[in-house]
């Protein structure tokens, strides 16, 4: 089923992008705090 591949990619992006965003925010806050 090709839909499964598309769903897996969409789910991976849906989880990956917010994680990167949070890591970038945390890095900015950490560098500012120190």
From Swiss-Prot:
**Name of the protein described by the UniProt record:** Photosystem II reaction center protein M
What family does this belong to?
Answer: Belongs to the PsbM family.
Membrane-spanning segments: 6-26
The subunit structure is: PSII is composed of 1 copy each of membrane proteins PsbA, PsbB, PsbC, PsbD, PsbE, PsbF, PsbH, PsbI, PsbJ, PsbK, PsbL, PsbM, PsbT, PsbX, PsbY, PsbZ, Psb30/Ycf12, peripheral proteins PsbO, CyanoQ (PsbQ), PsbU, PsbV and a large number of cofactors. It forms dimeric complexes.
Query: So what does this one do?
Result: One of the components of the core complex of photosystem II (PSII). PSII is a light-driven water:plastoquinone oxidoreductase that uses light energy to abstract electrons from H(2)O, generating O(2) and a proton gradient subsequently used for ATP formation. It consists of a core antenna complex that captures photons, and an electron transfer chain that converts photonic excitation into a charge separation. This subunit is found at the monomer-monomer interface.
The topology of this chain with respect to the membrane is:
Single-pass membrane protein
Which terms under GO biological process does the entry name? photosynthesis, light reaction
Where is it found, in Gene Ontology cellular component terms?
Answer: photosystem II; plasma membrane-derived thylakoid membrane
Checking InterPro entries in the record gives: PSII_PsbM, PSII_PsbM_sf
Q: Where in the cell is it found?
A: Cellular thylakoid membrane
Arranged from A to Z, the UniProt key words for this protein are: Membrane, Photosynthesis, Photosystem II, Reaction center, Thylakoid, Transmembrane, Transmembrane helix
């Amino acid at each position: 089923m090709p839909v499964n591949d598309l769903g897996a990619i969409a789910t991976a992006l849906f989880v990956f992008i917010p994680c990167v965003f949070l890591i970038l925010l945390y890095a900015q806050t950490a560098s500012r705090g120190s």
